Regions:
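Flexible inter-repeat linkers and adjacent short helices
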Residues: 1-105, 282, 324, 332-333, ...
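Alpha-solenoid helical repeat architecture
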Residues: 5-6, 45-50, 93-100, 133-140, ...
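Structural register within alpha-helical repeat arrays
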Residues: 16, 57-59, 105, 145, ...
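Residue at a conserved register position within TPR or TPR-like alpha-solenoid repeats
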Residues: 20, 61, 102, 109, ...
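Helix-turn-helix repeat elements of alpha-solenoid scaffolds
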Residues: 21-38, 66-85, 113-124, 154-164, ...
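Amphipathic alpha-helical segments of tetratricopeptide repeats
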Residues: 34-41, 77-91, 123-134, 163-174, ...
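Loop-centered beta-sheet repeat module
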Residues: 159-229
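Long, ordered, amphipathic alpha-helical scaffolds
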Residues: 244, 251-376
């Protein structure tokens, strides 16, 4: 009978696997995952290591769902099925296992656009952060927290965390994708501060880095974010130009990104009064929505149709705003209500316009309250 493989040796390999996951290196991560699974069959009994393996399978699938949404890998369990395995461990987790369990669960909730839930898990994970010695893992934590607070429009908190993450990533060339993503978050925060002149250099730096590493997905996302920044600053012409560039790359290289790009393009055209052209892109966007992960963008396209068609569908607008309210997406409520108010105001329906402007003010108030997300 062959000698059992020490669990410590398998643990080292899982650490290497995680390193490849954090670098978004799918081929290397796949190879190491297969090697770990083979080693586990011959490994000495170690329940902690098996839990660590389950957590890493979950994190691996989160990476794949982000980079290759809709792609299937044989008969592997989905991220939702994997969630069940890490939610019911055989014993109470402590130390690093507890940290990873909370941190990865927060990432899952973030991907589901449940930002309040995500931040709740991140806050619990933060209590275990002192035991994390790996500098890159600390950067990962600060990046994910900054990303969540950015989406909740807690701008100062987001900026506090993202600058810590970027400071680490910039010293590690293998983490260029995380550097790009950190630049996105910084630029987004500057946009929220209405310092558009400070946002664009970060986005242009991200685009340059994405082109240097020849990553089509992040080239498209960089162009999309540049377009969004121009849109927020009121430069419709430059916004449409960059949306079109992002759409071209998306159609050719990253089709799963296309609905998001076409939504931004459609909304900018609608606000600019070019509704006929916008509705062509809305139809194209809806045609590309197949995956469950795109449900959010389907709702946004339906919002544009409800607001900008000849007869405004006020009931549909309220239904969609209720959908955003359930998810605490106050920034979307603010932006969508503002668009609806402007349309009603332009057609001299001042009562309806006033009602939607009140929703804008309420959303701004909710953003400032921040759901008490960092009240300890």
């Amino acid at each position: 009978m062959s000698q059992a493989i020490p669990s410590s040796r398998v643990g080292v390999k899982i650490n290497e696997w995680y390193k490849m996951i954090r670098q978004f290196s799918v081929p290397d991560a796949e190879i190491l995952k297969a090697e770990v699974e083979q080693d586990i069959q011959q490994m000495e009994e170690d329940q902690d290591l098996l839990i660590y393996y389950s957590l890493m399978c979950f994190r691996h699938q989160l990476m794949l769902d982000y980079l290759e949404p809709g792609q299937t890998y044989g008969n592997r369990p989905t991220v939702t099925e994997l969630l069940e395995t890490i939610e019911t461990p055989q014993k109470k987790l402590t130390g690093l296992l507890k940290y990873y369990s909370l941190f990865f669960r927060g990432m899952y909730e973030f991907d589901q656009k449940e930002y309040v839930e995500a931040i709740g898990y991140y806050r619990e994970a933060e209590k275990e952060l002192p035991i994390v010695s790996d500098e890159i893992e600390k950067a990962e934590f600060h990046f994910k927290v900054a990303e969540a607070y950015y989406h909740m429009k807690q701008t100062h908190v987001s900026m506090h965390h993202i600058l810590q993450a970027l400071d680490i990533y910039q010293n590690h060339p293998l983490y260029s994708i995380r550097t790009i993503q950190s630049l996105f978050v910084i630029a987004g925060n500057y946009d929220d501060f209405k310092h558009y002149d400070k946002a664009l250099p970060h986005l242009e730096a991200a685009l340059e880095l994405a082109m240097d590493i020849q990553n089509d997905r992040f080239i498209a996302i960089s162009l999309l974010n540049i377009a969004n920044s121009y849109d927020r600053s009121g430069d419709d012409q430059m916004a449409v130009e960059h949306f079109q560039k992002a759409a071209k790359v998306s159609r050719e290289k990253v089709p799963d990104l296309l609905p998001k790009v076409l939504f931004g393009l459609s909304w900018t055209l609608c606000k600019a009064g070019q509704t006929q052209k916008a509705f062509q892109f809305i139809e194209e966007g809806l045609d590309h929505i197949t995956a469950r992960s795109h449900k959010f963008y389907k709702e946004l396209f339906l919002f544009l149709q409800a607001v900008y068609k000849e007869t405004v569908d006020e009931r549909k607008i309220h239904d969609l705003l209720s959908y955003f309210e359930k998810k605490n997406l106050h920034a979307y409520i603010e932006a969508c209500s503002r668009s609806a108010a402007a349309v009603f105001e332009s057609s001299c329906h001042f009562e309806q316009a006033a009602a939607f402007y009140r929703k804008v003010l309420k959303a701004q108030e909710d953003i400032l309250k921040g759901e008490c997300l960092y009240a300890y």
